[in-house]
């Protein structure tokens, strides 16, 4: 009798194990993949909000450096180790865990978000034909912000454009597509970096001109064609192109 019960128990366990294999193959509940997030227009709009937020975070870190490295502020006892290093001029270029890494990471967070918008956004026009102009405007703003980050990164991590006669010195990576976590991107010349910046700003101007303009008094807080022209003027100034 005992042997019979043991065999029956084993058979039930075996049946349960084989029967559960299909049950366990379920989608993650409460989690959204990148593809599913961008399947709706609302996801694209939320991503743009996040893009502006990440840009703000970058400049929050960027502006801190000038203040902390000057005598404009007094360091408080509860200052972070990172802030103390900047204040005491201990933030070194080779310090991969300090401020040089912080700015690099913050800027490329912005670039990554912009690349996702620019990769998935155009496909939504087929699903939302009535909102095509809104999508164009969102894409235009993303192009501008990506160009802005490439310019800021080149200012921090490269020499100025005229450092060599043909701008053949090292620029910064300019990824234009979503990347895997472990992807590596080569650093092009600064001339190639600026070529990408100018291309992004050209695309931004075209899409912003074709897209629905922002209204309601809040447009001054967002990217516009005027902002594109202003940034283009700054880029040409850095290039020494005054024509």
Where do the model's predicted regions map?
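Bacterial Sec-dependent N-terminal signal peptides
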Residues: 1-30
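Membrane-proximal, proline-rich intrinsically disordered regions
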Residues: 20-69
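Conserved, well-structured interaction surfaces
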Residues: 83-157, 188, 206-209
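Short coil/turn linking the two alpha-helices of tandem helical-hairpin repeats
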Residues: 154-161, 212, 238-241
